[in-house]
Amino acid sequence: MKKVLIIGAGFLQDFVICKANSMGYETYAVDADPDAVGFKHAHHHSVIDIVDEKACLKYAMENCVDGVLTAATDYGVLTAAYVSQKMSLPGLKYKVAQLIKNKYEVRRCLCEHHVDDTEQTYEINRNTDVGYLTQILSYPVM
């Protein structure tokens, strides 16, 4: 039986755990919440923070998983990519996962490649001159 690690075991990942079970996979789940709903359905689970890449990798290696994924959360994307890359499993490259986690970079990339209707992107931080920015923006903004 193939083993799959699901990064996250909350309400939004529970469906994935149940689906993997129904497809015949042996499911492993990690989540920082000891009462995560998905733990009830996973064959195996461990209370591990899903942003702790090294701890998740250790758990995956100890259990010789054949695949790793996350669903419906940005928090587990980097960890899933990290684990899959370190274990030579199929998955997102870590650099792609980093891009996905950075909403500004996603919007900038989409804008540069004319993938959506974004015509302007700005990254805002504590050093941003908001007064100047309000003058140059095209409205409405989101």
Annotate each predicted stretch with a short phrase:
Residues 1-95:
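ATP-binding N-terminal substructure of ATP-dependent carboxylate-amine bond-forming enzymes
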Residues 99-142:
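Active-site nucleotide/adenylate-binding loops and adjacent lid/helix of ATP-dependent enzymes
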